[in-house]
């Protein structure tokens, strides 16, 4: 039962899809995430889907242009949820997971998390800078010992796959993580600035910044998503 003295905010659902262009099972999950994103945006719900492309399938012959070893490392922290590491894996608020193409199960997990009050309130703004993206955050949390994560997200990308399991396919992506960083929060209250570099070829149109706070032992407690203003 929630502590009545703990500040509570509207529920949120951060959906991390661990995916790869080198995995033949992943395109259907990418399409599922795109539908989740579109429905959430139309309804104005606190659902924050993001694709994180892992690098461990590159050996199959196709190097995913959006992959990053940090996303593979992050997925490894979720191994306890299912007992294995696989793609496509969808993780909701860091506490539950399912096969990313299982839309009914994913929707059920999302609704379960939205029904829970968030315990961290995040306010966020972002603008393009000479070095990449500069973000300003303000946090009000009931739990002080947390980590703040920041992800710069491209709205839409497409890729023509030439080799590997998806050779010959043209894959479409929504909400693709392109820059990622974390920092510890000593206090549950405060504000700060953050600058992240962007990769070559970054598409600015529709890009956004996602921030979320998470407990050291797992579980996302609050999140915010904003567009990026011109520099």
Where are these regions (language model features)?
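Short, conserved sequence motifs used for protein processing/export or organelle targeting and
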Residues: 63-87, 91-231
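Typically the conserved alpha-helix immediately C-terminal to a functionally engaged Cys/Sec
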Residues: 25-41
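Short active-site neighborhood of thiol/selenol oxidoreductases, capturing the structured segment around
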Residues: 9-24, 50
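N-terminal cysteine/histidine-rich coordination modules
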Residues: 2-6, 29
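Extracytoplasmic
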Residues: 10-12, 44, 87, 145
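Solvent-exposed loop/turn segments at secondary-structure junctions
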Residues: 20-24, 32, 54-59, 96-99
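Thiol-based oxidoreductase modules, predominantly thioredoxin-like and allied folds used
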Residues: 43-72
């Amino acid at each position: 039962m929630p502590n009545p003295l703990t500040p509570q905010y509207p529920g949120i659902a951060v959906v991390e899809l661990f995916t790869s262009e080198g995995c033949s099972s992943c395109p259907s999950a990418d399409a599922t995430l795109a539908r989740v994103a579109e429905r959430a945006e139309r309804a104005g719900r606190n659902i924050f889907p993001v694709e994180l492309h892992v690098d461990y399938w590159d050996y199959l012959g196709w190097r995913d242009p959006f992959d990053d070893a940090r996303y593979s490392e992050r997925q490894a922290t979720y191994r306890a949820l299912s007992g294995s590491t696989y793609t496509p894996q969808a993780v909701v608020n860091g506490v539950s997971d399912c096969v990313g193409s299982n839309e009914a199960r994913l929707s059920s997990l999302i609704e379960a998390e939205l029904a829970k009050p968030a315990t961290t309130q995040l306010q966020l703004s972002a603008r393009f800078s000479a070095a990449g993206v500069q973000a300003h955050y303000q946090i009000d949390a009931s739990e002080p010992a947390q980590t703040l994560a920041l992800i710069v997200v491209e709205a839409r990308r497409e890729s023509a796959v030439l080799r590997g399991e998806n050779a010959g396919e043209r894959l479409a992506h929504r909400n693709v993580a392109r820059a990622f960083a974390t920092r510890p929060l000593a206090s549950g209250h405060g504000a700060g600035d953050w600058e992240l570099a962007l990769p070559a070829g970054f598409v600015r149109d529709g890009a956004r910044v996602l921030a979320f706070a998470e407990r050291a032992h797992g579980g996302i407690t609050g999140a915010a998503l904003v567009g990026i203003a011109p520099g």
